[in-house]
Amino acid sequence: SAITILYSIFGIIYCALLASKFKVSLLFAVLQVSFYIVQSVLYKNWGEVILNSAIVLPIILASIISWYTGADKKKEQVTKNQLKNYEWILLAVIFVVVAISFYFILDALDTQNAVIACISCAFTAAAHYLLLRKSQYMFHVFIGLNIVLFILWLLPIIQGDGFGIESLPMLITLVVYSISNIRGIVNWSKEKKASLASVT
């Protein structure tokens, strides 16, 4: 469908810019998430609709402000944050609370594959918290999210529910996301080493 194609196009552009032009990529993330919400409505993945509308889109918009205001205007770099111990505890609590609460919400909405969907919601909340905090570990959590989402969108094909082959662009985009996140890990590691070298 046109929605799936547009989602994939904006998603691939987002991925292409993710590692090297992260702040610019967030602008395409807004478009990508918007089309993803529409796509999720068509597939009746209500967990994705609720979470992306109420949490992910606002977090990305807040992240755009955070990343642009935190940028070094000369180096075009952003100060990365090291999460404190209490934040990791908070992140774990967020993951568990979102997973459990969304399971009951999705079950009440008679959502297919509710268990996978609620795990996806938990990964989404955790990944975007790390995005907002400008943590390098967001890439690792986003890879986990991509794997869960791949399973979530693959299941309708396996189960023979509705859209079938129309899910393929979605699956391809998720693979591209994972590759891009791996690039992000490598890129940020290089930046960290360069930063440490300049200090010493």
Labelled PLM ranges:
Residues V97-T111, C118-F139, I151-L154:
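Alpha-helical transmembrane segments in multipass membrane proteins, preferentially the mid-helix core
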Residues S34-Y43, E87-V96, G144-P156:
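Small-residue-rich segments of transmembrane alpha-helices in multi-pass membrane proteins
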Residues L131-V199:
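C-terminal transmembrane-bundle signature of multipass membrane proteins
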